[in-house]
Amino acid sequence: MGKIIGIDLGTTNSCVAIMEHGKPVVIQNSEGGRTTPSIVAYTNKGERLVGQVAKNQMVTNPENTIYSIKRFMGRRFEEVASEIKMVPYKIEKGLNGDARVNISNIKKQMSPPEISAATLTKMKETAEAYLGEKVTEAVITVPAYFNDAQRQATKDAGKIAGLEVKRIVNEPTAAALAYGIEKKHEEIVAVYDLGGGTFDISILELGDGVFEVKSTNGDTHLGGDNFDDEIIKHLISEFKKESAIDLSNDKMALQRLKEAAEKAKIELSGAQEASINLPFITADANGPKHLQYTLTRAKFEQMVDHLVQKTKEPCLKAIKDAGLKASDINEVILVGGSTRIPAIQKIVKDIFGQDPNKGVNPDEAVAIGAAIQGGILTGETKDMVLLDVTPLSLGIETLGGVMTKLIERNTTIPTKKSQVFSTAADNQTSVDIKVLQGEREMAAQNRILGNFILDGIPAAPRGVPQIEVSFDIDANGIVHVSAKDMGTGKEQKIRIESSSGLSESEIDRMVKDAEAHAEEDKKLKENIEAKNTANSLIYQTEKSLKEYSEKISIEDKETIENKIKELKESLEKEDISLIKSKTEELQKASYKIAEMMYKDSSQQNASNQQENGTQNNTSEEGKEADYEVVDEDKK
C-alpha cells in the first residue's frame, strides 16, 4: 500500500501532512509555506491559479478569484443567501438546485467540489514533490457539523482531484489525534475549532490509544470570515460618514477592504490597535480618496461580541450531550486561526473554567491528525483506534409530516439501525421514503437528504404490510438507506446523494476536465519555457553579433539577422511549434559567432601563454642574477 496523505481542506487555508518513520510531518508547498491559501483564480487568458499566486491578484480580479468556497459545498442555492452577500464572485443556481460559481473569464459555471478539487490537486502535487512518487490516496477532514451532502461534496472534490478518499474525518477529531498521539494516560478533552468559515466543538475521551468522540456540536455558518465582515461593514460605514461615498458596491474596493480587515484582525491578536491605510480606495469629482482608520482592540471586540457569544450555546450542548460537567474536562484544545483572537480565548476560559491548552499548532493540527488517520489505515500507526460520531440525527418522514428518528445524533459510527413501518392507506402498493437529517420534530423543518420509492407492495389494508427501513452510516459519516417489504422480500437500496449533489456523470466529466487542466498546465509551462528560450537566444545572439560583427562575413551576418527577425515575428504570432523551429534555425545560424568566439579565445590563450612564458623566463633569470650578485658580495 502506498502513502496516504492527510489533507486539511480549510475555508481560508489548506495544509497537507504525511507519516514518516512513525511521526507526522507537515509538507511545505512550492512557495515555502506550510499552509496554502484555499483560493482559486482564473485570469483573463483563462489560466488557472491556485494558492498564494491566486491570492496575490485578488484585488485586481475580484469576480474571478474564488475564496471561502467551502461555505458553498453541498448546499442548495436557497440555503446560501447570506453567504452570497459576503463574496464578490457570482453565485448562481445550478440545474439541480445547487449553488454554483459563474466564472466570466472562462465563461463557465463551476460547482464548489470542482473548485475545491483545484486546491486538493495543489496539496496532492505538494506531497508528490516531497515524496518523489505518485500519490493517489488521502484522508480529508471536514467540519464535525457538516451534513451528509457536504461530506459527499468533499468526497467528490477528492475524486475530481484524482484522489481516492480513504476516510473523511471530522476536524476536531483529527486535532485530538494530533494532540493525543503521545499521550498515555486517560483524559477528557474538548476541541474548540473556529476556522475561517465554520465552528465545531467536540468532546472526546482519550485513553490506551482509543479516541472516542462523546459528542459534537457546531455552526457551519460561523467563522473568521464573519469577523472580517464586521470590520468591513464598520469601515464602509465610517468612510461613508466622512466622504459621503458608499463603497459597498465597488467590488475592487471591497476586495481591498477584505484584505485590510483580515490583516487588522490578525494584528489585534497581539496589539491594542491596528492602522488601516488604503490610499486611492476610490475617487469623486474632487479627485482620489484615501481610507485611513485606526481600529482598537476594544472597538473590534465590541463589534464581534455577538459572534463570540454564538460559540457558547454549542459548547454547553456538547458538554450536556456527553453527560458531563465543564469541570470534568481535563484539557481544552484550540484549533483554527480564529482561536488566536483574545476575546475567543476569554470565552473559552469562561465556559470551561480553565485556560485553553495552546500546545497544538492551530493551523497544522488538523492536517497532522488526518495524516495519523492515514497511518492507522495503512497500519503504519499502531495501537490507535478512532471512534467518531454522527453530528445530526437521521430519520424518515412518517404520517402527518413528522420526522421519525432512526439514528440519534452523537451515535458512534459506523452504525446500522432498522425499524419496521407500515402503509398509511388501504391498498397502498408503494411508499415514498424521504430521508431526513436534523433535530426538529417536523419533517419540513429538517434537511431532506434524498428520497426513493419502494413499489410492488401487495395491496392490503393499511397497517398490514411490514416495511423494514434500515439506515447504515459508514466510517466517513455517509448515509446508506434501504427499505424492504418483509412480505415479498423486495428491497430498494440507495446511497444518499443530496438533491444538490453531483451525479456520477458530472463527476466523471469534472475528473476529465481536471486531467485536461493538468495537461493544459503542463502545456502552458512548456510554452512559457519555449518563449523564454527564444527571447534569451535573441538577446545573447544580438549581444554577440554586436561584439563580433567585424570578424564574421557579411553573408553570415545577414543570415543571422534574418533568423533573429523571423524568430521575433514567430513570438508575436504565439505559434509555439513555429517558435521552436525558428529557435533551432537561429541556434544553427549563430554557430558562426560561436566559432569566432572560440577562435578568438584560443588565440588569446595562446598569446597569454607566450607572454607568461617570456615573463617567467625573465623572472627566473632575474632571480639567478640576484643570487649571483649576492654571492659575489659575500666572496
Swiss-Prot record:
Alphabetical UniProt keywords: ATP-binding, Chaperone, Nucleotide-binding, Phosphoprotein, Stress response
Origin: domain of life: Bacteria
Family (UniProt): Belongs to the heat shock protein 70 family.
Region of interest: Disordered: 599-635
Protein name from the UniProt record: Chaperone protein DnaK
Gene3D superfamilies per the UniProt record, alphabetical: 1.20.1270.10, 3.30.420.40, Actin, Chain A, domain 4, Substrate Binding Domain Of DNAk, Chain A, domain 1
Cysteines paired by S-S bonds: none
Functional note: Acts as a chaperone.
MF-aspect GO terms: ATP binding; ATP-dependent protein folding chaperone; unfolded protein binding
Induction profile: By stress conditions e.g. heat shock.
Alphabetical list of PROSITE patterns matching this protein: HSP70_1, HSP70_2, HSP70_3
Record PTM Phosphothreonine, positions in chain: T198
Sequence ranges of Low complexity compositional bias: 601-612
Biased composition (Basic and acidic residues): 620-635
Membrane-crossing residue ranges in chain numbering: none
Pfam families: HSP70
